């Protein structure tokens, strides 16, 4: 497909001047030293003061989603989920492919004359004539929501083969690329040099995304296998200098705890596991796929990490229906039982993971909708602190956290076994002060009365979520 012309970006004189200044600094100092400390935002504004909540297209559509489907999803979210805090609509991988699903050697890309991917106009008709994602982003913003896209780290190999000039710079694509560095599962990108030429390319794409009105970037092949700190810094720096508030999410997992400080300097959220899908235990035919049981162990490793506005990400919530599943196969509903779906929600919320739904929203049934619209459960994810596991056995796990207002505790109890269990805990066993506590079930929104200890009857893979407050 021939390159698509791009409308000229319009920025304030101040913004253009800042972009020029940063490029000059990078030329003088080198990327590695200049990018170690990102320039501060005004008043150190947190772009994600609470865990981001939204929807991502991958679980439902893989690379095959269309503009019509994105718009329908945004409309459903605005009507049903927005009042509960859900706000991001994110298009995952492949929006620039003219032939999604083709063999890797046959993939056809849509890009401009500066080597920047553009939406495929056959699937995103509002992007014609170089409009890019701006019309779609404008529509999503008109609904009171925010718009996000997935990118692969690096620069397109096709841009390097054609040696295209990088926008707003004296460099060409071949000067920015590391041609022996490709992503293990998507080889159509080259890594980018930790040098002014590489920074120039990241500046060029972030400038374009800011022009479109992007609010969220999910950057892939950067957080683990392989971990690319230099490219993460360059991307974060380029986003900062657009002067647009853009949340940065990095993938895939498992992000190493050794990199926690560095990653949290540059991204608002990062994946803690391999791709999470709708199963309990490991799958022999998909060893890369993380199930719920393993996610308990992964979350526990990150429990002590607490940085304001930075969120370890347990991955998307595979709920509801998948018309074109991102993990392959025919259209299907989630494989998780109702008990397992509740357990997933309870773990994500008590852990305070970002909540990013993966299922198809316009076809969501009443059960799925209710899972996503319980304000008391959502508050556990959004408005708590001090999350930690206090019981970690092979058969049962308990987490606690404290509500934002300091009144009482949230307690999540999980049966990890394959049989019914009656679990009893003294409050002190849960690291709570010895007292009589009033107990409220957050899913049923019912007060259960006072208790001197906690007793819970749970089916296999089931869980419960409570708010408990000590009596005077």
How would you name each of these model-derived features?
Residues 19-30:
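Bacterial N-terminal signal peptides
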